[in-house]
Amino acid sequence: MTTNLIWILYRSDSDTAYKETLNCKKIIEGYGKKVLFSEISNETNNINQLFLKSEVLPEITIVLGGDGTVLRAARYLSPKNIPILSFNVGGNLGFLTHDRQILKQETFWERVSNNRFNIQKRMMLEATVFREKNNNENTIKKSFFALNDFYLRSCTDEIAPTCSLALEIDGEAVDRYKGDGLIFSTPTGSTAYSMAAGGPIIHPSLDAIIVSAICPMSLASRPIVVPPESQLVIKPIRGMKQKIKLWLDGSSGCLIEAEDTCLIKKSNHSTSIIILDENHSYYKTITQKLHWASSLNNPNKQ
């Protein structure tokens, strides 16, 4: 990492994130680094402009926002293997972000300028939507990457929002789901939508794919964890009047029509997450974020 270039991406709807961006830029430039920055949101993608402006890739990218901002940034930065250092500025839970107060510490900036930090590799998923043609050949309709999850849900407003989906894993029929949809999650995303749907929490150092049904009509439809090399194929059950949409990390993907097939698998790309704490504990993170064991950490609480 000797390019002396650092990017900053900030949450577009946060004045605080923009002000923090200007402060960070000033400090980083004081260490002899060049800084380029841009806003990021669901509606606008200015990251490609940074790629065009930069003759070299950045050493790291600082992301100022919440987990959603990090997820959006990861889709563009991970294929280039650019490490992400994120801070919770205007976000919510912040499983992927550091406390923004760290930005005020002079020792922090010295560590960043000298590349004194750890990097965690986080598994990503890839989804490819195929369209079946009359000659039974499939053509690629769309491809997407996600750090947290993909999910398929009904997008019909006129009738009850349920959908019927068939799932195959490695060529073997597994289940036919009827309900609000299906979630396909990484271990990083296991504390997001999948957890809300009753899925297990998986340590992010593991590679696995979690399949969780959203409000299934059958009590037999339970979450399942499959190996990372699994090939998961999802097809709308034909003959049903339904419109289904693929979502990635909470952002709109594309419509899945009756003649479409969606293949979900582990991506060849991974997200590089910078961890500043040398004694970082994932269990401490989820205990704090999910308020577990509060009576153990606070002996005065009964």
Curated annotation (Swiss-Prot):
Lineage: superkingdom: Bacteria
Function: Involved in the regulation of the intracellular balance of NAD and NADP, and is a key enzyme in the biosynthesis of NADP. Catalyzes specifically the phosphorylation on 2'-hydroxyl of the adenosine moiety of NAD to yield NADP.
Location of the active site: D67
Swiss-Prot/TrEMBL cofactor(s): a divalent metal cation
Keywords: ATP-binding, Cytoplasm, Kinase, NAD, NADP, Nucleotide-binding, Transferase
Pfam families documented for this protein: NAD_kinase, NAD_kinase_C
Reaction(s) the record says it catalyses: NAD(+) + ATP = ADP + NADP(+) + H(+)
A GO molecular-function descriptor: NAD binding
Residues that hold NAD(+) according to the record: D67, G68, R72, N148, D149, K178, D180
Family annotation (InterPro entries): ATP-NAD_kinase_N, ATP-NAD_kinase_PpnK-typ_C, NAD/diacylglycerol_kinase_sf, NADK
Name of the protein this chain belongs to: NAD kinase 1
EC main group: transferase
Gene Ontology cellular component annotations, sorted alphabetically: cytoplasm
Taxon lineage: Bacteria, Bacillati, Cyanobacteriota, Cyanophyceae, Synechococcales
EC number: 2.7.1.23
Localization in the cell: Cytoplasm
One annotated GO biological process: NADP biosynthetic process
Family indicated by similarity: Belongs to the NAD kinase family.
